[in-house]
Regions:
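Bacterial N-terminal signal peptides that target proteins for export
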Residues: 1-10
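Bacterial N-terminal signal peptides
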Residues: 9-19
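Flexible, solvent-exposed loop/hinge segments and secondary-structure transition points
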Residues: 23-141
Length: 141
């Protein structure tokens, strides 16, 4: 009985000292936009489009493509909800502007089948938001 207890204490001590190192190797950290920053980005895009005479919807997704913010101008059509969300998702997912993706996925090009993936928006209006070499989010208009 005493030996079993000593063995249990030794095993617990071993796990306690090796767990932080093992955990550090088994996890990773990511960076992303706060919802406040995502909202500011969406507001800036909406204002720029208004100044250019466009009524739009603007979506900002996190780096995984999950929508954080959506703004729709008063006269923006109902299609703008899905269009903006899919452009933000595409830009974040592929880490490329949707205009560039549209060019790279034209019929006959090696990556043309990407257009068959649900939610891919291969048309202009989506950009990845990047900082320090990392994609933080996607924005779509």
């Amino acid at each position: 009985m005493k030996f079993a207890r000593i063995r249990s204490v030794a095993l617990a001590a071993l796990l306690a000292t090796s767990a932080p190192a093992a955990m550090a190797e088994a996890t990773f950290s990511t960076r992303g936009l706060t919802v406040e920053t995502a909202l500011k980005a969406a507001q800036a895009a909406l204002e720029a489009c208004r100044k250019a005479g466009y009524q739009v919807g603007v979506a900002v997704s996190d780096r995984s493509g999950v929508m954080q913010v959506y703004l729709r101008d008063r006269f923006a059509g109902p299609h703008t909800v899905d269009a903006a969300a899919n452009k933000a998702w595409t830009a974040a997912s592929f880490r490329i502007s949707t205009t560039e993706l549209a060019s790279e996925t034209q019929p006959g090009k090696p990556m043309s089948a990407i257009r068959q993936i649900p939610r891919v928006a291969a048309l202009g209006g989506g950009l990845p938001i990047e900082a320090a070499g990392s994609t933080l989010a996607g924005i779509g208009v």
